Each structure stands twice: as structure tokens, then as C-alpha cells.
Design a protein with these regions (language model features):
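ATP-dependent adenylate-handling ligase core
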Residues: 1-3, 9, 30-40, 91-94, ...
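Phosphate- and divalent-cation-binding pockets in alpha/beta enzyme and binding domains
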Residues: 3, 23-24, 157
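Adenosyl-5′-phosphate
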Residues: 10, 14-16, 47-253
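Short acidic/histidine-rich active-site segments
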Residues: 12-28
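A mobile, often basic/glycine-rich helix-loop segment
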Residues: 24-50
């Protein structure tokens, strides 16, 4: 994203971005995932947990147990949905789908907006987000899910509302998730950096992450490096860099 913004900045000082369109109009896969719909938790965690599995979890087991992250997530979920008022005559299904929309608008998208703001401002690019206009969000928010997905597809309402303004190829295009790096050299580079980190056994990151899990991911044969393993290595290296840069006092009690 940073490199994309950097390239845009060579030609323009302002750009438009689509953050919040998926949240408002229902574009993410978890909106259509029955398991994620039924779960009494943040729906994206269901999908991420299924897609990434345990390989993405690199924190030490004793630390995760002490932090009691499951209770933290459960408390956060209850707080998030507590303020969603049920509409008169609203079915159980429609109420659940509106809660899912609410969760994405109040919890999920703000992470994306923060990422967008930081990456764009780093190169001096102003990125505007028209789908975050409060008038649009307020107008569409209470639209029933049966209308938002009237043809069984993602963002049905948005596509139909703009059908006479966009090419048919765009109208028919299936949502493509944000791309991840596919070059195997990237995974190998992550492994090399992780091996360098493992060679520093006294590094404070190992007070937080499971050294054995990092070791297994760092020494796995290249064709066997899953996206989950990559994610675990990325988290470890990011955490190590943060500790190196800011040297915080981390008190584990």
C-alpha cells in the first residue's frame, strides 16, 4: 500500500479510496459465511482463525493464558453489540446481519482507515474516503440485508445503484481481497530475518513469543511455508523491531 501511494504521489496530491464500501454494503466473505454469521464473536475472527490456524499464533502459551485473550475478545464483542437496537418487526436473521454490519463499521474499518492514513501521509498524499460520508452510512445502514444482497452477491445495492455509470466489466467483477505478496522470495527473506533473530537468544522478543514456533517456521522448507506461517513470522519480526526502536518496559505479572 505504501508503494502504491508512493507511485500515485508522483502524479497527484489527492486520491480516492474505497474504505467502508464493503462495511456499509456487505462486501466481505464473512457476510456470506454461515459459520461467521452464527458465531457470537467478531465474524472476521472466525474466518481468520479458519484460514490461518495455529501457525499464526506465536505468543508464548503461558502468556496467552495469563492475558486471557478469549475473555478479552468476548467482552469486547458484548460491548460492541450492546448498543445495536433491534428494529420493530425485524427478523432474527436481519437483526444479526445488521449487527455484523455495525461491527465492521465500528471495529473493523477503523483499522483500515488508520493504515490508509499512515501510509498516505508518509508520502504526502491526501486520500479521501467518499464511502465514509456519514450521510451515506446513515442512509444505507438500516437497509435490510435482503435488499443489500438481493441478487445473492456482494455489494448488490451499490452495484445496481451505479449500473448506468460504470462499465459492465466492473459491474460483473467479483470482489478481489486485498492482495498479499506471492513471490516466494519474500517468505525466504522472512525466514532469513527470523533466523538472525533466533541467533540472538537474549532478545526481549522471546519473553513474548514462542521460540520453538518461530524456529519451526523459520526452518520450514520453502514450498511448505503457508500464509499462516508467514503471518507468524511477520508478527514476530514486527514485534522485535518495535522493541528495538522504542525499548519499552514490558512488565509481565
Amino acid at each position: 500500500l505504501y508503494l502504491l501511494f508512493q507511485a500515485i504521489r508522483e502524479h497527484s496530491t489527492v486520491a480516492l479510496s474505497g474504505e467502508s464500501a464493503d462495511e456499509v454494503f456487505g462486501g466481505y466473505l464473512q457476510f456470506f459465511d454461515e459459520e461467521a454469521r452464527r458465531a457470537e464473536t467478531f465474524p472476521w475472527l472466525v474466518r481468520f482463525g479458519r484460514d490461518f490456524g495455529d501457525d499464526a499464533d506465536v505468543l508464548r502459551p503461558d502468556l496467552t493464558e495469563a492475558l486471557d485473550l478469549e475473555s478479552y475478545v468476548a467482552d469486547g464483542y458484548r460491548t460492541a453489540v450492546a448498543g445495536v437496537r433491534r428494529l420493530d418487526g425485524e427478523s432474527d436473521f436481519e437483526y444479526r446481519m445488521r449487527r455484523i454490519c455495525h461491527l465492521h463499521l465500528t471495529r473493523f474499518v477503523r483499522v483500515l482507515l488508520d493504515r490508509k492514513d499512515r501510509a498516505s501521509m508518509a508520502v504526502g498524499l491526501e486520500v479521501r474516503v467518499p464511502y465514509c460520508d456519514h450521510r451515506l452510512v446513515e442512509y444505507v445502514y438500516n437497509a435490510p440485508w435482503s435488499l443489500k444482497s438481493f441478487d445473492g452477491r456482494e455489494k448488490s445495492l451499490l452495484r445496481e445503484a451505479t449500473a448506468d455509470l460504470i462499465p459492465k466489466s466492473v459491474y460483473d467483477r467479483v470482489k478481489s481481497p486485498y492482495p498479499s505478496t506471492q513471490d516466494p522470495k519474500y517468505a525466504i527473506a522472512l525466514q532469513d530475518h527470523a533466523k538472525d533473530l533466533l541467533a540472538r537468544p537474549a532478545h526481549p522478543v522471546f519473553d513474548l513469543v514462542d521460540r520453538e514456533r518461530v524456529h519451526r517456521a523459520a526452518h520450514r522448507d520453502s514450498p511448505q511455508i503457508t500464509q499462516a506461517s508467514r503471518r507468524g513470522l511477520e508478527r514476530t519480526l514486527d514485534l522485535a523491531l518495535w522493541l528495538d526502536m522504542y525499548a519499552p518496559d514490558v512488565l509481565l505479572t
